[in-house]
């Protein structure tokens, strides 16, 4: 029931993005998506992306902490490469971001229960 409430509230909050009437913008579309797409496409080809020649005049990719190449949630990205373009499907990044909100809600419930809050109070605070 707790998972259902977390998923339902997240779906309501992000309904515009989940149902395709809106999308994330600014840093997501201009920096995060190109970096994630490059890393995922290189991994799908079986190559380690040490250098990114497409950003600026070229820059280290694997050493850039903002590329988030070793972040566990991004390990699924190579499986969602569009074969026609060779790029990552943009919706996948949005779904991963939204999934983090579900994880945050569930973590808050377990934290509050661990601190002695009632089950109703823990659900209400999350």
Predicted stretch roles:
Residues 1-3:
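N-terminal membrane topogenic signal
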Residues 108-126:
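Transmembrane-helix signature of polytopic, membrane-embedded enzymes
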Residues 7-108:
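Membrane-interface coil-to-helix junctions
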């Amino acid at each position: 029931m707790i998972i259902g409430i977390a998923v339902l509230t997240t779906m309501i909050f992000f309904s515009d993005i989940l149902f395709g009437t809106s999308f994330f913008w600014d840093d997501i579309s201009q920096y995060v998506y190109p970096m994630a797409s490059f890393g995922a496409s290189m991994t799908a080809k079986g190559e380690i992306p040490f250098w990114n020649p497409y950003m600026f005049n070229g820059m280290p990719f694997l050493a850039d902490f903002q590329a988030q190449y070793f972040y566990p949630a991004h390990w699924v990205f190579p499986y969602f490469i569009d074969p026609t373009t060779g790029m990552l499907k943009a919706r996948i990044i949005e779904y991963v971001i939204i999934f983090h909100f579900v994880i945050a809600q569930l973590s808050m419930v377990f934290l509050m229960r661990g601190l002695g809050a009632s089950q109703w109070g823990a659900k209400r605070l999350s």
